[in-house]
Curated annotation (Swiss-Prot):
GO BP terms: intra-Golgi vesicle-mediated transport; intracellular protein transport
Subunit structure, as described in the record: Component of a SNARE complex consisting of sed5, gos1, ykt6 and sft1.
Membrane spanning residue stretches: 69-86
Residue spans, topological domain Cytoplasmic: 1-68
Membrane-protein topology: Single-pass type IV membrane protein
Name by which UniProt lists this protein: Protein transport protein sft1
Position of the signal peptide: none
Keyword Transport recorded: yes
Subcellular location: Golgi apparatus membrane
Lumenal side: 87-91
The species this protein was found in: Schizosaccharomyces pombe (strain 972 / ATCC 24843) (Fission yeast)
Keyword Transmembrane helix: yes
Domain of life per record: Eukaryota
Length: 91
């Protein structure tokens, strides 16, 4: 009778251990899905921000002279490139 109880106890212990592992796996996957959802929301927000910035840029281009805007954009890009290459040359 004691041997039978010991076997049943070992079986029950194995089942409890399996249940713990399954529960931990479910918890881990739920955390992964939560992380994925947060990343998706973040990228969605970034996409909306870029879209709004683009719309605002084109609205400014339409209202102001194109030549003046393009000159300003080229000056900004040129300045960034000059700073970038100058910093590489000095450091």
């Amino acid at each position: 009778m004691n041997d039978q109880n010991e076997r049943r106890l070992e079986t029950l212990s194995g089942q409890v251990s399996s249940l713990k592992n399954v529960t931990y796996d479910i918890y881990s996957r739920a955390n992964d899905y939560t992380r994925i959802d947060r990343a998706t929301e973040s990228f969605s927000g970034l996409s909306n921000s870029v879209k709004k910035s683009t719309e605002n840029f084109f609205r400014v281009v339409r209202s102001a002279g194109r030549r003046r805007i393009m000159t300003m954009v080229l000056a900004i890009v040129g300045s960034i490139l000059i700073i970038y290459y100058a910093s590489k040359w000095f450091f």
